[in-house]
Amino acid sequence: MTVIAETPVIQSARNTGFVWLDLTRKCQLECGHCHNGSGPDGTHGTMTAEDWTRVLNEAAAAGIPGVQFTGGEVTMHPDAPHLIKHALTLGLAVEVYSNLVHVDEDWWKLFRGEGVTLATSYYGPKDAHNEVTRRPSHAHTRANILKAVKAAIPIRVSVIVSDPADTGQAACDELKALGVKTVRVDHVRPFGRAADGQKPCTDGLCGQCGDGRASVAPDGKVSPCVFSTWLGVGNVKDAPLGAILGGPEMAQANAVIRQSVSLRPSFGCGPDSPCGPDNQPEPQPDNGECSPGFPGSSCSPRN
């Protein structure tokens, strides 16, 4: 059930510290749980290179320290390399979330650059991984994780499990044996393909959406996070990013999300995951990092 706050308290948004640039819905894979339904038939949306460049400029001007490029598959967007380089020239910290299926040398050169970190998802042994991605992708992703480690590229990996009883420990052990230092476990979220046709609702959110972070979609729509895209709070084609982040629509969306979280019972949290939808977390402190894909968080935008 979605909880609607009848009279939400509108408060000014605190300084945003992180923005997802959700570039595309195109992806080589077609993961059964993909939170935004990306796949081979997806598009890059209506945002142009100029639009994304303006968003980066506005993010830097607003004092936002870092961005994550995500999708879909970032490496399939023709303007992604230019946009990443531009973000770096602005002094923004950059994380690229990739499935690491096909990475050419130009992309490796970019990944090795100062100020760039890498993130990916992993689903376990070969058969389990390929079942999720619906493609024979396991060998490619695993090999490229190892290549990133050997190249000393900072990389974090989210182990995604669909069974609440699965701790993901075997996959974590495998990744750590490869040399990955940052490995977290998270559970599938009830959005996109994983929603099984159900309408999205706030019950599947962690409660920290929009709290110091926001997401910009391929059509320019801004939402509190990559999982809450139906809670649009503005569009960067119509208004500056900073104005949207500090606007009343974002504050109201945050209030609705907070009210939803505060009204549901707490049953604790899953393995290493502060916000799996199979758990009912208590409201997080203001400095919590329970945000999908946020560096250092267990939440993954691939879920």
What residues fall within each predicted segment?
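Flexible mid-to-C-terminal extensions adjoining Fe-S/redox cofactors in radical SAM and related proteins
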Residues: 1-10, 15, 228-303
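Residue-level signal for mature regions of secreted extracellular proteins and peptides
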Residues: 20, 24-27, 199-202, 218, ...
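Conserved alpha-helical substructure of the radical SAM core
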Residues: 1-109, 113-114
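Radical SAM enzyme [4Fe-4S]-AdoMet core and its adjacent flexible, acidic
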Residues: 109, 113-239, 243-246
